[in-house]
Amino acid sequence: MSTVTITDLARENVRNLTPYQSARRLGGNGDVWLNANEYPTAVEFQLTQQTLNRYPECQPKAVIENYAQYAGVKPEQVLVSRGADEGIELLIRAFCEPGKDAILYCPPTYGMYSVSAETIGVECRTVPTQDNWQLDLQGISDKLDGVKVVYVCSPNNPTGQLINPQDFRTLLELTRGKAIVVADEAYIEFCPQASLAGWLTEYPHLAILRTLSKAFALAGLRCGFTLANEEVINLLMKVIAPYPLSTPVADIAAQALSPQGIVAMRERVTQIIAEREYLIAALKEIPCVEQVFDSATNYILARFKASSAVFKSLWDQGIILRDQNKQPSLSGCLRITVGTREESQRVIDALRAEQV
């Protein structure tokens, strides 16, 4: 009699799945963590809700209303979830039939679009960006048949640039009546003028992902948002867990989204942008750095001579960067989160010492 292992019982697509390599999963024993695009220092909050004996609201009113006001949309156009990552998955679960429909995304970009689709058993199609990392609209048009959700990250992670707004409009026209277009705006606080939130009334098939993990300095909270028209939100509400946000998470999120919380966030953004420009200028003068790319975010992508050796050398010194070599068109590239001035100086000094 053949022995069936536990792994044999698992779904085939799960057996074949490569999990997303998050910064924490990749590990390292560093003291300068510049690999996850987090804010470099902790922001303090006091819990005000002492009702942990009760289940939380599914969509906490204060969080939804505060975020709607901040984003300039109606409360019924907002869904809150466990990070934007849950929003990515909810959109696939609501709109894609496993084994029939597909998602489409444009590498090099964020890795969770493919992981979420593959976990659910939904086909992934890719249309690599052009040499300038802008959308290949003809390539997308050629592959749209059977696609239900298109993910576009803007500013794009890991390249750091904004997608041309006219290309977004063309994409939204191409997909009208066919697919949901998801603009992943995880880093939009660093370039708020580029948000598509004002386009929701014009495009019923547009959804926007947001997070408190970056400019709001709350990566450990796991709190994200989907902005979309009410019809889309109602469908997502059918597939979301009954209690996606714990009471402490909702409590802190509401405080972070208060008027004073928004002011504090904008002060952090100003500080990070100034530090980003300092680091970009310094990187351009370092011999082992071949190219530094413009950034609209809190991280910098740069191409290095002997990038793998540079990555390991800094890793061994406790400076943890993000290796992008395996991403399409990013050979030799490392991504550096913008941290404190002290952290920037550690990176600069370590890179200057590299022998190339």
Curated annotation (Swiss-Prot):
GO terms for molecular function: histidinol-phosphate transaminase activity; pyridoxal phosphate binding. It catalyses: L-histidinol phosphate + 2-oxoglutarate = 3-(imidazol-4-yl)-2-oxopropyl phosphate + L-glutamate. Its cofactor is pyridoxal 5'-phosphate. One of its GO terms (biological process) is L-histidine biosynthetic process. Pathway: Amino-acid biosynthesis; L-histidine biosynthesis; L-histidine from 5-phospho-alpha-D-ribose 1-diphosphate: step 7/9. Keywords: Amino-acid biosynthesis, Aminotransferase, Histidine biosynthesis, Pyridoxal phosphate, Transferase. The modification N6-(pyridoxal phosphate)lysine is found at residue 214. It is an enzyme of class 2 (transferase). Its EC number is 2.6.1.9. The keyword Nucleus does not apply. SUPFAM superfamilies: PLP-dependent transferases. InterPro entries: Aminotrans_II_pyridoxalP_BS (IPR001917), Aminotransferase_I/II_large (IPR004839), HisP_aminotrans (IPR005861), PyrdxlP-dep_Trfase (IPR015424), PyrdxlP-dep_Trfase_major (IPR015421), PyrdxlP-dep_Trfase_small (IPR015422). Homodimer. Belongs to the class-II pyridoxal-phosphate-dependent aminotransferase family. Histidinol-phosphate aminotransferase subfamily. HAMAP family: HisC_aminotrans_2. This is Histidinol-phosphate aminotransferase. It comes from Shigella sonnei (strain Ss046). The gene is hisC.
